Amino acid sequence: QTTARRVAALWLSLVLVAATGASPVHAERLVTDMAGRTVKVPDKVARVATIGPVPVLNSFVFAMGEAATIANNLPPNLGGSRWRFQYVVAPQIATLPVIQSGEGPSVEGVAQVAPDVVLTMDRPTIDLVERTRTPAIYLAWREPDDVKAAMRLLGALYDRPDAAEAYCRYFDETLAKVSARTDALRDAQRPRVLYANLKNLTQPHRIAEWWIAKAGGKSVTDDGRTSEAFNFSIEQVLHWDPEVIIVSAAHEIADAYADARIAGVSAIKNRRVYAVPMGAHVWGNRTAEQPLTILWAAKAFHPELFKDVAISEEVRAFYANFFKSKLSDNDIDVILEGRAGEH
């Protein structure tokens, strides 16, 4: 815990700036973001704009229980039913302005929503936002544990360190719960796993190499790369012979089973093709829901080891405790079956 406190202090220095006789309404604080920048922010943050990978950033805010503070809608390319749970958790964003397009963020849009702070994972955005005299906080998620540093930074920003620590505790405890059952598995007991877009023949996000391993699997695309995407061929799929295939949406399962090119692959023959869940974001990519990803994958890879784990109840509790959102049974089914984009 001492080490954790030191790390938190390094990333999240939060200093009250006292002004003699100043009204509390105008009080300000200094926050150090994940680029090492010291940023002056209002004492109370009530409105935030998210620019860049908006669903990821929103998921951080959701996990703080602060969905109501988001002041902008999703970009146009992220509209439609696939992102429905962004609107379930933060219904107000449906009628709020869009402040970025495929060409990038809009200075006018930022000025229009008048946020207290802009959250971004894009360094060039910082310079643009500062033209509006709006504080910009940079968050990073390069390595798996960065999500905890990001949450602690938001805990400082919202003056809710307790909420940030609750999330970090859940993250660590969930991983420990899975590891307690999978650490003793021999290599032969860990299934070969391919997480992929089979239409484009890509593995879209490097973080999948981490959660597949944490869940007790062996990612066939894990070659130690540092780039995000991984391209491969059908011949490589046949060579890898994955025992489990994970696709990005429910409708892709039927496509995989119908693809004659991979009919002889173990995952196809044994009917072990699954759609990764989709809630606030795709669970296979970067999202605050990542602990749930690992638990879901562990149960998919090792159903006997995790037969006592009710994933649906984990999802219900996570959304209630962190996102402050009550899900129906149908909502949970849609999330877990990867059907968010299907009508």
State each model region's role.
Residues 205-229:
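Alpha-helical, coiled-coil/dimerization segments enriched in small aliphatic residues
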Residues 8-21:
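Bacterial N-terminal signal peptides
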Residues 1-5:
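N-terminal secretory signal peptides that target proteins for export/translocation
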Residues 148-165, 183-185, 253-343:
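Structured C-terminal subdomain patch of bacterial secreted/periplasmic proteins
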Residues 99-102, 106-120, 134, 233-250:
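Proline-aspartate-enriched helix->loop->beta-strand connector
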Residues 72-75, 120-122, 138-143, 157, ...:
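Short beta-strand->loop
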Residues 50-113, 117, 217-220:
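A short, structured surface patch at a secondary-structure boundary
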Residues 19-60, 95, 162-194, 306-343:
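Bacterial Sec-exported substrate-binding components of ABC uptake systems
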